[in-house]
Amino acid sequence: MRFCHFFWLILFLAACNTNKFMQSTNYPPENSFLDTLLKAHLQEFTPVYNDTAKYRIQIIYTRIDRDAQNRPHFHDYHYRADTGRYFYPASTVKLPAVALALEKLNDLHIDMHTPMFTDSLPGITPAVLTDSSAENGLPSVAQYIKKILQVSDNDAFNRLYEFIGQESFNRSLWAKGYSGTQIRHRVGIGGISPEGNRHTNAVSFRRDGQLLYQQPALYSSLIFPPRHDQMGSAYYNDQHVLVNSPMDASMKNRIPLADLHRMLRSIIFPGAVTKTQRFRLRDSDYQFLYHCMSMQPEESVYPSYDTTEYHHNYVKFLLFGREKRQDEVTDIRIFNKPGWAYGFLTDVAYIIDFDNKVEFMLSATIYVNDDGILSDEHYQFKTTGEPFMKRLGAIIYQYELQRKKKHLPDLSRFKMSYSQ
């Protein structure tokens, strides 16, 4: 067994690419570390590995090495990662939303816990004046972020989308270098046209009866670069009629996996990215995001969740496979944001094992829709997607457990207390 571990370590070192960030948009799938590693575990990934084109798999793994000053150094490895290959990002769009909402609050000098009230937008979304999940019964950016990161709440994202505004949302991300990203619509709501999603509700912040900020209803006149993305081989339209042609995804949200991976890196390691790439957040903002990302639903009081539905690993796909049972024996925390819809399952994660001083970043997406029909809800998330994510995370984790490090990481920045 020791010889096998040493053998794979030698193969890994031979395949290492020490570039901090690969500029190419299409990363070679063959003769890479990840390709070698997946082949070594071929039986565990059959039939997924045998038909990676069908499953549209993309993987990015970041090895993290610390120096004597605990500064992180990154080595990225890609498997079939291609910024030109479309996948529906689903709820992963909520990751930049939480950061941009906090960034906007900082620009306005408003605390994240300040009550935020949203006016109605006729025919699109209703007003929000109360929030029964909050301790004080009032909506706020902080409460929306909790619900987004703990259980991937759709309405919470939509309210942040409305606060940020479609045009500002995209321009802010493009200015940070995420030029392939397009956030064009709310999520989890049918029947809103692309034009309707350009409109966002009026928002106000009030504390103790005092108006702190009033934002009028906004309209985005942003011109998006044209796209020709498609999904599936057939789909059910809004009238529940089967259309026997691919769904036009050119007006859907879009985030390449590489952009998601870099967004998470910017949040987890803000000091390791350039100032232009960094979200304008305070240290307390980062600590709040880390806390919400890594917290389990049963550890939350406000909001409080029914743990029969929102179980321990409800949003933990990589390594934990979204399994209800908890049998890990070490202190592992996952800082992540997943998304699943239209047969696409994506997870973007920073994984820590505090007991064994292990840390790594792993992002992956897989398409599990055997019949090719969208909106029929016949997707293989449980039978194919979640087991794939669990095993992929486990393989990288086991490799990291065995990998020798010159300097063990000090992970105290990410050690949280979850008692409330």
Task: Give the ranges of each region predicted by the language model.
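Active-site-adjacent helix/loop patches that line small-molecule binding or acyl-intermediate pockets
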Residues: 25-45, 49, 53-55, 133-269, ...
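Short, glycine/proline-biased beta-turn/loop segments that scaffold the active-site neighborhood
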Residues: 107-137
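Sec-dependent signal peptide recognition
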Residues: 2-9
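Extracytoplasmic
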Residues: 52-56, 74-76, 82-84, 88-93, ...
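A short, well-structured edge-of-sheet supersecondary motif
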Residues: 39-81, 114, 362-364
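Structured C-terminal helix/loop/strand segments within mature extracytoplasmic catalytic/sensor domains
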Residues: 20-46, 51, 241-420
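Active-site SXXK
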Residues: 87-116, 362
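C-terminal motif of bacterial Sec signal peptides marking the signal peptidase cleavage site
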Residues: 14-15
